Amino acid sequence: MKIFHSFHDFKPKNKTIVTIGTFDGVHIGHKKIIDKLIQNASQNKCESLILTFFPHPRMVLQEESEIKLLNTIDEKTILLEKTGLDNLIIHPFDKAFSRLSAEEFVKNVLVDQLNIKKIIIGHDHRFGRNRTADIDDLIIYGQKYGFEVEQISAQEVNAVSVSSTKIRNAIIEGNITLANKYLGYPYFLTGTIIKGKQLGKTIGFPTANLRIEENYKLIPQNGVYIVQSFLNNNLVYGMMNIGMNPTVNGTSLSIEIHFLDF
């Protein structure tokens, strides 16, 4: 998979089959769209392409919301690479970009920059300034500028449509089992092991302290969890405790893992 950090850097040699979105979580609903994207690209001898954005648009447009995300940008990139995608564009999202009208976005980005043959979108996709345009507008622009449009229905689990918001809420509520079902894989954290107070060692339960660098990563609620971890490419099991530790300046989040038989 080729990675580009702006659509201006992408120089397509072939026509592209494109999908657009934030893809937070890369959940089973996203996978349904991506599978269709890759299938279409193969059938039409085109390149498959995802256009996503960072920061998340809500971080820019709703600064007070402090949204927490299911994936860091590195985690999302790894998950998308596993799908077999040809190209990933992570375009910087800012207020100037958000002011593009729907037609400006279609003409200047999809047509002129991405050399689009077809766009595949989810059931609730909206775009353009203030997210005013929808599938009907996209079909009209497709007819005007010469590309195809296909909309994918929602992926459902037990008659409930899967969304990143529902997964975030499940994690916040402590329902990791439901979140994992919607994701299609176990929810995970990535970080750096740092030296802690080493109190666990004194009672026979040495722990590793995990530091999460990105403050926008959604951390499950405080509690004890069974975890699988990859250490030096080895899969090990353990118990993870998430809680608050007293510090000089108050309290800080602590993520400690006791690895079993390691």
Task: Please report, for each region that a protein language model flagged, where it lies by residue.
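Glycine-rich, highly charged phosphate/nucleotide-binding loops
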Residues: 68-76, 99-106
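N-terminal catalytic cores of NTP/NDP-binding nucleotidyl/phosphoryl-transfer enzymes
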Residues: 7-72
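A glycine-rich helix N-cap at a beta->alpha junction
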Residues: 75-88
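Phosphate/ribose-recognition catalytic cores of enzymes acting on nucleotide-derived substrates
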Residues: 196-262
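Classical nucleotidyltransferase
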Residues: 99-206, 232
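Short acidic-hydrophobic, aromatic-tinged amphipathic segments that line or gate anion-handling sites
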Residues: 2-8, 89
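Residue-level signal for inorganic ion chemistry
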Residues: 27, 80, 119, 179, ...
